[in-house]
Amino acid sequence: MKRTGHSTFIQKYFLTTAIIILSHLLPTGSVLSDVSLPGIFGDGMVLQQGMKIPVWGKADPREKVTVSINGRTKSTKTKGDGTWMVKMKKMNAGGPYEMEVSGTNEIRFTDVMIGEVWVCSGQSNMNFRIRNLGDIPGQLGDADTPEIRMVTINTQKHEQPQDDFIREKPAWIPCSSQD
């Protein structure tokens, strides 16, 4: 026996009701995500003096992100893809400072210096430690200069461009006769 009128209406009613209920229960793609920054940012980092300082990362789309360092604050809203960037005003050499980045969460970096940033690259000799040269009278004892920092980015192979790298903790280490 074929029922078309009443049972078809009931099926459509229950199907529509189920879709409406599920649409309110399922995630909509807007999953809360903490504010994050690339691995180059970390405690003890050095930021370039004498130029606008770029700070960037990821968060929820259209989330307000605020960056503060040494009494200077700048805010932005993330783009639709969740990326964000602010350019802090120029700063002179100095520190140590704290840098806070906040959105749905807060990240705090300590011992931040403003100064000269040098980028060095090379082959395997870039990993050679001066202390391995042996006894260099007077050289290593004078190497305790904690204002000088170094970050090492490990070699990684990828088939596609990357927007971050995996770093070891701590990222930035001060210059010392022990390293």
Question: Across the structure, where does each feature detected by a protein language model lie?
Answer:
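Short linear, low-complexity motifs centered on an aromatic residue
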Residues: 1, 28-29
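Charged, low-complexity surface segments at secondary-structure and domain boundaries
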Residues: 1-2, 18-21, 133-135
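N-terminal secretory signal peptides that target proteins for export/translocation
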Residues: 1-11
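Cell-envelope and extracellular/periplasmic
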Residues: 32-179
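Bacterial N-terminal signal peptides
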Residues: 13-27
